[in-house]
């Protein structure tokens, strides 16, 4: 029965329709896999077994009576950032202690309406602030991947580390995730899974705990490109409850898979060749270029001159927005309250006890750059630089480029409690150097597994597209997937 | 620009986060590392460049001005640490 958990969503869809097994059997297989693995991987922070069985039974009814929906009976994991009615929703923070929303996020509402089954809530960096899933109040997630012959625990990346680890370790068929600076694509690259951050405005942000509102976007992490397309189709919608939700119909992303890339122009930005990047990543990038060329795409060198300023601009814009969004955690309306002598001390004590170190650091930076006298020098300047970053991309696309190919991350997965990363916050931030530009410009980006390094750890490539042209990303990522093959961790857990 | 420990304490007060001497001193180092990193933005010529307000050009949507929601006092206070009859309870704020 354990093999059921190895099926992709497209396989599940076909086999459930053929009555090879029931949705309940599939859900039970996942629940038992979680029970065995979770103590070691810590991917789930809460498992909703009863709810999962109930939803699976309802799917079986549908499958029996006809009228199966697009994700009928597909067991999914949900990042703890998504509000799920009556179920643990804490953004993996202590400050949202015991919070159980009375409402459901739009993205998860869409998934349940399409017949998906909720297995539970997934671990993540606290408030999605981190690149290693080590800032979670619930402890780090362990990457199912290990070095060849080694037994050192590695990080799964972050902030959607639980989502990526659960998908890679066969603990859910697919997962929801969110990406503010690389939080879908970097963990996907670290775990040999596929992750897409769609265009800003494609998925509703309603009911997703806010980190940096002008950058946050939801997207799926999946086992392959097709599954990512199937999931995004369900997650995306036009939502009157989110004013930044864009009024464009959601296309059938799956239909783009398998389409030829002949004649497509793929841009290779020279600024992504950064100092200190491992030779293996450079080599993998070249392989990706060859694969695209072999498939008939035209390769063109491009320049995105403001690339190096994206990360510093991000570390002004994102903390500024976070400091404002996180002002709501005051010990009054929900979550943790720590008493004080007066109301101000109650606020200060609650926030000191409730927020972790990385979250406090970002609130402090954000408060500082927005404070009187510094706003122009920091925040306004960063937003002007952001305009320039976006303009770089616009010029490339205007010149006829259809998609841009880059490495997904500057390294493979690193060890948990890495001393260098812990000693220097900026070092950790550099993980997002290739992904953050995409958030700053609001564009879609997909990370697709492309190979293993000499230690046997996964590496990914990223494709960046025009706004609302996710279809070209699925089309091109599929070429890489077919050329590179799929990668699975050895089960040690 | 760099910050000293007194600035860090002032910012912590603005952010309503209690810090002790040790926290403030650690944060001073961390904040200065980050502020040092973002300093490179000063190299960029931003003359005449409009600050970004929205990544996707869009006009704010309008909706009909009608009541579509409400009467959920129970739901709204359900997660509060202390409530009484649909009110949030806070420490006394006026003498």
UniProtKB/Swiss-Prot annotation, chain A:
Keywords: ATP-binding, Ligase, Nucleotide-binding, Protein biosynthesis. The gene is gatA. The keyword Nucleotide-binding applies. It catalyses: L-glutamyl-tRNA(Gln) + L-glutamine + ATP + H2O = L-glutaminyl-tRNA(Gln) + L-glutamate + ADP + phosphate + H(+). InterPro entries: Amidase, Amidase_CS, Amidase_dom, AS_sf, GatA. Signal peptide: none annotated. This is Glutamyl-tRNA(Gln) amidotransferase subunit A. GO terms for molecular function: ATP binding; glutaminyl-tRNA synthase (glutamine-hydrolyzing) activity. Allows the formation of correctly charged Gln-tRNA(Gln) through the transamidation of misacylated Glu-tRNA(Gln) in organisms which lack glutaminyl-tRNA synthetase. The reaction takes place in the presence of glutamine and ATP through an activated gamma-phospho-Glu-tRNA(Gln). It comes from the Bacteria. Pfam families: Amidase. The active site is at residues 79, 159, 183. One of its GO terms (biological process) is translation. Heterotrimer of A, B and C subunits. Belongs to the amidase family. GatA subfamily. Its EC number is 6.3.5.7. It comes from Chelativorans sp. (strain BNC1). GO terms for cellular component: glutamyl-tRNA(Gln) amidotransferase complex.
Curated annotation (Swiss-Prot), chain B:
It catalyses: L-glutamyl-tRNA(Gln) + L-glutamine + ATP + H2O = L-glutaminyl-tRNA(Gln) + L-glutamate + ADP + phosphate + H(+); L-aspartyl-tRNA(Asn) + L-glutamine + ATP + H2O = L-asparaginyl-tRNA(Asn) + L-glutamate + ADP + phosphate + 2 H(+). GO terms for biological process: glutaminyl-tRNAGln biosynthesis via transamidation; regulation of translational fidelity; translation. It is an enzyme of class 6 (ligase). The keyword Disulfide bond does not apply. Gene3D superfamilies: Glu-tRNAGln amidotransferase C subunit, N-terminal domain. Disulfide bonds: none annotated. Keywords: ATP-binding, Ligase, Nucleotide-binding, Protein biosynthesis. Pfam families: GatC. GO terms for molecular function: asparaginyl-tRNA synthase (glutamine-hydrolyzing) activity; ATP binding; glutaminyl-tRNA synthase (glutamine-hydrolyzing) activity. Its EC number is 6.3.5.-. The keyword ATP-binding applies. Belongs to the GatC family. Heterotrimer of A, B and C subunits. Allows the formation of correctly charged Asn-tRNA(Asn) or Gln-tRNA(Gln) through the transamidation of misacylated Asp-tRNA(Asn) or Glu-tRNA(Gln) in organisms which lack either or both of asparaginyl-tRNA or glutaminyl-tRNA synthetases. The reaction takes place in the presence of glutamine and ATP through an activated phospho-Asp-tRNA(Asn) or phospho-Glu-tRNA(Gln). This is Aspartyl/glutamyl-tRNA(Asn/Gln) amidotransferase subunit C. The gene is gatC.
């Amino acid at each position: 029965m354990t093999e059921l958990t190895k099926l992709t969503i497209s396989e599940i869809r076909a086999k459930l329709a053929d009555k090879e097994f029931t949705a309940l059997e599939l859900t039970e297989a996942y629940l038992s896999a979680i029970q065995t693995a979770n103590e070691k991987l810590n991917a789930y922070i809460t498992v909703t077994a009863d709810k999962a069985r109930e939803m699976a039974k309802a799917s079986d009814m549908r499958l029996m009576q006809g009228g199966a929906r697009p994700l009928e009976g597909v067991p999914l994991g949900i990042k703890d950032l998504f509000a799920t009615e009556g179920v643990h929703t804490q953004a993996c923070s202590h400050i949202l202690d015991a919070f159980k929303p009375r409402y459901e996020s739009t993205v998860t509402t869409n998934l349940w309406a399409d017949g998906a089954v909720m297995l539970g809530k997934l671990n993540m960096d606290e408030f999605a602030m981190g690149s290693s899933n080590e800032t979670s109040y619930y402890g780090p997630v362990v990457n199912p991947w290990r070095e060849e012959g080694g037994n050192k625990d590695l990080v799964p990346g972050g902030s959607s580390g639980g989502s990526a680890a659960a998908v890679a370790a066969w603990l859910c068929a697919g997962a929801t995730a969110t990406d503010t600076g690389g939080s879908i694509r970097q963990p996907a690259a670290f775990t040999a899974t596929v992750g897409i951050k769609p265009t800003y405005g494609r998925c509703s942000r309603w009911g997703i705990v806010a980190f940096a509102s002008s950058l946050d976007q939801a997207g799926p992490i999946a086992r392959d490109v097709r599954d990512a397309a199937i999931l995004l189709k369900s997650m995306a919608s036009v939502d009157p409850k989110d004013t930044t939700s864009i009024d464009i119909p959601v296309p059938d992303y799956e239909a783009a898979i398998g389409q030829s890339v002949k004649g497509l122009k793929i841009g290779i930005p020279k600024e992504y060749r950064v100092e200190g990047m491992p030779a293996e990543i450079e080599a993998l990038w070249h392989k990706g270029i060859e694969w695209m060329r072999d498939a008939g795409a035209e390769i063109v060198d491009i320049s995105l001159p403001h690339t190096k300023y994206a990360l510093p601009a991000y570390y002004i814009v994102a903390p500024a927005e976070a400091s404002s969004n996180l002002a709501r955690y005051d010990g009054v309306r929900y979550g943790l309250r720590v008493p004080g002598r007066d109301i101000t001390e109650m606020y200060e004590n609650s926030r000191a006890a409730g927020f972790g170190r990385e979250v406090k650091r970002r609130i402090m930076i954000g408060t500082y750059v927005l404070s009187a006298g510094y706003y122009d020098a920091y925040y306004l300047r960063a937003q002007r630089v952001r305009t320039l970053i976006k303009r770089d991309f616009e010029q490339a696309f205007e010149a006829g480029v259809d998609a841009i190919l880059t490495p997904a991350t500057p390294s493979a997965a690193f060890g948990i409690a890495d001393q260098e990363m812990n000693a220097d916050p900026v070092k950790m931030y550099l993980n997002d150097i290739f992904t953050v530009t995409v958030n700053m410009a609001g564009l879609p980006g997909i990370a697709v597994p492309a190979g293993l390094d000499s230690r046997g750890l996964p590496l990914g490539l990223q494709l960046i597209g025009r706004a609302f042209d996710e279809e070209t990303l699925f089309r091109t990522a599929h070429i890489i997937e077919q050329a590179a093959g799929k990668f699975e961790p050895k089960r040690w857990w | 620009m760099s910050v000293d420990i007194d600035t860090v304490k002032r910012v912590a007060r603005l952010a309503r986060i209690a810090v002790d001497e040790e926290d403030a001193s650690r944060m001073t180092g961390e904040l200065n590392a980050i502020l040092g990193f973002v300093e490179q933005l000063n190299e960029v010529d931003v003359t005449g460049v409009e600050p970004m307000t929205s990544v996707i050009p869009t006009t704010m949507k309008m909706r009909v001005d009608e009541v579509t929601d409400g009467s959920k006092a129970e739901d709204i206070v359900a997660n509060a640490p202390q409530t009484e009859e649909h009110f949030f309870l806070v420490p006394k704020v006026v003498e």
